[in-house]
């Protein structure tokens, strides 16, 4: 069962503002060190606080900052506020199929600890953390605050994606950039895009990501009418792997959509664009409900709920699952929130207090506004679900109007839909690709091979599609 996040008490706001200011000022002083000429993942400082049940919970820095721009003054320092502490952080796993949502103690005290890892760097070779370490090759995409380039490391020759965020003198560093960097620095998983480096100058903040060839949206556009069932299964498994990893670390992605799921030329799927992500365990005000692209936004958020849990992401998983199989978006609203809800209720039924306890208390739920629909079998709306064993059952457990009824990522990985996959997939380490397991590979889609499609690059669209 999903607990609710408690609002931050007024007397704690001052402390969180101090944390904001300290971390924001420290952001410009990041000194990235490498032990050799290969890429190495970077870590985020984790602070532990006692929660209501007396268990350690994880706080990711910067996630209590209000969603505005943070002014950063450049100074020089070797202090890195994002290094891991020496103490180990305990994680709590859900004991049932429900999504995870933890309450944090209002009396908890934050005490960051920093451990430095020093290593010499070659005085003659370009260094990580400096603009001259990378060569721009071509422009991939552009957003309101950021431009994404395909680039190459001068250290080891590997391709990278350079997300260059323009800093305004008056506005400072965009907050979503700080949030994305602070979270990604601590995430090490094969199914999460890797942040290699951060470069800060007076004019720009550059996030250096691993280079990935395309995204799921473009892949589905290239192969209309639904993907190969075996490929759907492998893509979904990887998506759930990545989500399970971040959810166990109390992080919500909050913006799941095909454009934010990158796909390499070997078929690896990677979660990207963490500009809207949040660490759930941080005491704060309830979150903005303007966070997820409309088609993939869950009904509880559409109805005004701001009490989020990992269940928020699982609705998006269900929508993406159906879209991969059917070849069309599950709920392609054309007008507004009202239209989006009508499309959902047409399939799942108009909710009431019996089917969704508490729905009448949601700010935007007005029964008289909605047509009364009865729920349908999902195959009536999306017939291709009936062609794949156990697909309809899994989709129905993800697409639940009541968030507490949605399957968690960890539970979904154990669903019978995946029963024909090799058992070794569940034994992989976090950084191991599923394609290291024998006989696990993508099948050719109708019309074109994966390799040919990989040449049609859309990576820049995904990285520049954030709020930056």
Swiss-Prot record:
<keyword id="KW-0963">Cytoplasm</keyword>
<comment type="subunit">
    <text>Found in a complex with LRP6, CCNY and CAPRIN2 during G2/M stage; CAPRIN2 functions as a scaffold for the complex by binding to CCNY via its N terminus and to CDK14 via its C terminus. Interacts with CCNY; CCNY mediates its recruitment to the plasma membrane and promotes phosphorylation of LRP6. Interacts with CCDN3 and CDKN1A. Interacts with SEPT8. Interacts with 14-3-3 proteina YWHAB, YWHAE, YWHAH and YWHAQ.</text>
</comment>
<feature type="domain" description="Protein kinase">
    <location>
        <begin position="134"/>
        <end position="418"/>
    </location>
</feature>
<dbReference type="GO" id="GO:0005829">
    <property type="term" value="C:cytosol"/>
</dbReference>
<dbReference type="GO" id="GO:0005524">
    <property type="term" value="F:ATP binding"/>
</dbReference>
<dbReference type="GO" id="GO:0000308">
    <property type="term" value="C:cytoplasmic cyclin-dependent protein kinase holoenzyme complex"/>
</dbReference>
<keyword id="KW-0808">Transferase</keyword>
<dbReference type="GO" id="GO:0060828">
    <property type="term" value="P:regulation of canonical Wnt signaling pathway"/>
</dbReference>
<keyword id="KW-0597">Phosphoprotein</keyword>
<dbReference type="GO" id="GO:0000086">
    <property type="term" value="P:G2/M transition of mitotic cell cycle"/>
</dbReference>
<dbReference type="GO" id="GO:0005634">
    <property type="term" value="C:nucleus"/>
</dbReference>
<feature type="modified residue" description="Phosphoserine">
    <location>
        <position position="94"/>
    </location>
</feature>
<feature type="active site" description="Proton acceptor">
    <location>
        <position position="255"/>
    </location>
</feature>
<comment type="similarity">
    <text>Belongs to the protein kinase superfamily. CMGC Ser/Thr protein kinase family. CDC2/CDKX subfamily.</text>
</comment>
<dbReference type="GO" id="GO:0005886">
    <property type="term" value="C:plasma membrane"/>
</dbReference>
<feature type="compositionally biased region" description="Polar residues">
    <location>
        <begin position="455"/>
        <end position="468"/>
    </location>
</feature>
<keyword id="KW-0547">Nucleotide-binding</keyword>
<dbReference type="InterPro" id="IPR000719">
    <property type="entry name" value="Prot_kinase_dom"/>
</dbReference>
<keyword id="KW-0131">Cell cycle</keyword>
<keyword id="KW-0067">ATP-binding</keyword>
<dbReference type="GO" id="GO:0016055">
    <property type="term" value="P:Wnt signaling pathway"/>
</dbReference>
<feature type="modified residue" description="Phosphoserine">
    <location>
        <position position="77"/>
    </location>
</feature>
<dbReference type="GO" id="GO:0051301">
    <property type="term" value="P:cell division"/>
</dbReference>
<dbReference type="InterPro" id="IPR011009">
    <property type="entry name" value="Kinase-like_dom_sf"/>
</dbReference>
<keyword id="KW-0723">Serine/threonine-protein kinase</keyword>
<feature type="region of interest" description="Disordered">
    <location>
        <begin position="103"/>
        <end position="132"/>
    </location>
</feature>
<keyword id="KW-1003">Cell membrane</keyword>
<dbReference type="Pfam" id="PF00069">
    <property type="entry name" value="Pkinase"/>
</dbReference>
<feature type="modified residue" description="Phosphoserine">
    <location>
        <position position="24"/>
    </location>
</feature>
<keyword id="KW-0418">Kinase</keyword>
<keyword id="KW-0539">Nucleus</keyword>
<dbReference type="InterPro" id="IPR050108">
    <property type="entry name" value="CDK"/>
</dbReference>
<keyword id="KW-0132">Cell division</keyword>
<feature type="region of interest" description="Disordered">
    <location>
        <begin position="448"/>
        <end position="468"/>
    </location>
</feature>
<protein>
    <recommendedName>
        <fullName>Cyclin-dependent kinase 14</fullName>
        <ecNumber>2.7.11.22</ecNumber>
    </recommendedName>
</protein>
<comment type="function">
    <text>Serine/threonine-protein kinase involved in the control of the eukaryotic cell cycle, whose activity is controlled by an associated cyclin. Acts as a cell-cycle regulator of Wnt signaling pathway during G2/M phase by mediating the phosphorylation of LRP6 at 'Ser-1490', leading to the activation of the Wnt signaling pathway. Acts as a regulator of cell cycle progression and cell proliferation via its interaction with CCDN3. Phosphorylates RB1 in vitro, however the relevance of such result remains to be confirmed in vivo.</text>
</comment>
<dbReference type="GO" id="GO:0106310">
    <property type="term" value="F:protein serine kinase activity"/>
</dbReference>
<dbReference type="GO" id="GO:0004693">
    <property type="term" value="F:cyclin-dependent protein serine/threonine kinase activity"/>
</dbReference>
<dbReference type="GO" id="GO:0030332">
    <property type="term" value="F:cyclin binding"/>
</dbReference>
<dbReference type="InterPro" id="IPR008271">
    <property type="entry name" value="Ser/Thr_kinase_AS"/>
</dbReference>
<feature type="modified residue" description="Phosphoserine">
    <location>
        <position position="133"/>
    </location>
</feature>
<keyword id="KW-0472">Membrane</keyword>
């Amino acid at each position: 069962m999903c607990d609710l996040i408690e609002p931050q008490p007024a007397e704690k706001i001052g402390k969180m503002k101090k944390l904001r200011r300290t971390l924001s000022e420290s952001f410009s002083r990041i000194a990235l060190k490498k032990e050799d000429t290969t890429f190495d993942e970077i870590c985020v400082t984790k602070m532990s606080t006692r929660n209501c049940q007396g268990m350690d919970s994880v706080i990711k820095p910067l996630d209590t900052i209000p969603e505005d721009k943070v002014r950063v003054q450049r100074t020089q320092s070797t202090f890195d506020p994002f290094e891991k502490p020496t103490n180990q952080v305990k994680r709590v796993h859900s004991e049932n199929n429900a999504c995870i949502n933890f309450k944090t103690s209002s009396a908890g005290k934050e005490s960051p600890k920093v451990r430095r890892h020093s290593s010499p760097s070659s005085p003659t070779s370009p260094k990580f953390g400096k603009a001259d370490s990378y060569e721009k090759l071509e422009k991939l995409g552009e957003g309101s605050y950021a431009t994404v380039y395909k680039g190459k490391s001068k250290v080891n020759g590997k391709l990278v994606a350079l997300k260059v965020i323009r800093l305004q003198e008056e506005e400072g560093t965009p907050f979503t950039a700080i949030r994305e960097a602070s979270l990604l620095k601590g995430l090490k998983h094969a199914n999460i895009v890797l942040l290699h480096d951060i470069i800060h100058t007076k004019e720009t903040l550059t996030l250096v990501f691993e280079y990935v060839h395309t995204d799921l949206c473009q892949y589905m556009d290239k192969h209309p009418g639904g993907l190969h069932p075996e490929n759907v299964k492998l893509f979904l498994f990887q998506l759930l792997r990545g989500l399970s990893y971040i959810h166990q670390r109390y992080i919500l992605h909050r913006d799941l959509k095909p454009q934010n799921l990158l796909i390499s030329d070997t078929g690896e799927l990677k979660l990207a664009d963490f500009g809207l992500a949040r660490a759930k365990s941080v005491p704060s005000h309830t979150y903005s409900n303007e966070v997820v692209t409309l088609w993939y936004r869950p009904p509880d958020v559409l109805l005004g709920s701001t009490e989020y849990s990992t269940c928020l992401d699982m609705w998006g998983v269900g929508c993406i699952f159906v879209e991969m199989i059917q070849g069309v978006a599950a709920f392609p609203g054309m007008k507004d929130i009202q239209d989006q809800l009508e499309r959902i209720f047409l399939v799942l039924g108009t909710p009431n207090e019996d089917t969704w306890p508490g729905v009448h208390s949601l700010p935007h739920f007005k029964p008289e506004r909605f047509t009364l629909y009865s729920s349908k079998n999902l195959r009536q709306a999306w017939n291709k679900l009936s062609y794949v064993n156990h697909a309809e059952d899994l989709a129905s457990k993800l697409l639940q109007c009541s968030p507490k009824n949605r399957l968690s990522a960890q539970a979904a990985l154990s669903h019978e839909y995946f029963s024909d996959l090799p058992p070794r997939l569940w034994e992989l380490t976090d950084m191991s690709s599923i394609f290291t397991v024998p006989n696990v590979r993508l099948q050719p889609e109708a019309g074109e091979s994966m390799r040919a499609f990989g040449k049609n690059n859309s990576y820049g669209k995904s990285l520049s599609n954030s709020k930056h």
